[in-house]
From Swiss-Prot:
Part of the 30S ribosomal subunit. Its main location: plastid. One of its GO terms (molecular function) is rRNA binding. The keyword rRNA-binding applies. Keywords: Chloroplast, Plastid, Ribonucleoprotein, Ribosomal protein, RNA-binding, rRNA-binding. Belongs to the universal ribosomal protein uS8 family. One of the primary rRNA binding proteins, it binds directly to 16S rRNA central domain where it helps coordinate assembly of the platform of the 30S subunit. The keyword Chloroplast applies. Gene3D superfamilies: 3.30.1370.30, 3.30.1490.10. InterPro entries: Ribosomal_uS8, Ribosomal_uS8_sf. HAMAP family: Ribosomal_uS8_B (MF_01302_B). This is Small ribosomal subunit protein uS8c. The gene is rps8. It is found in: Plastid, Chloroplast.
């Protein structure tokens, strides 16, 4: 399983069992992905944790008042089926209420940032 799919699956599974935190391997991709989720308000906090020689990222999840999840993630591009988009054709999620996370030549960013910089890239996932 690739890094992004592993991260998305970990977050989805944690929400299903109502966990407060998710622990994932500390990679640059996971860190940038988490930073975007934090900036957009989909998660509460990110912190680094060292267990022996391995580094992990711990994401603190956000819930609504009644314990409902606040985030839905849908993987778009996969290792066997890459999906790319030019900046004018980047889709909008729920009419702009959600975000698209892209992998571009300038790193991982949201659809809004990519449109502002006028660059396209690989569509990693939809978040709403």
């Amino acid at each position: 399983m690739d890094t992004i799919t592993n991260l998305i699956t970990s977050i989805k599974n944690a929400y299903m069992v109502k966990k407060q935190t998710v622990r994932v391997n500390a990679t640059r991709i996971n860190e940038n992905f988490g930073r975007i989720l934090l900036q957009e308000g989909f998660i509460r906090n990110i912190r680094e944790h060292k267990d022996g020689q391995k580094f992990f990222l711990i994401f603190t999840l956000k819930y609504r008042k009644r314990g409902e999840k606040i985030i839905t993630l849908k993987r778009i591009s996969r290792p066997g089926w890459r999906i790319y988009s030019d900046f004018p054709k980047i889709p909008k999620v729920l009419g702009g209420m959600g975000i698209v996370i892209l992998f571009t030549s300038q790193g991982i960013m949201t659809d809004r940032e990519a449109r502002k910089k006028k660059i396209g890239g690989e569509l990693l996932c939809f978040v709403w």
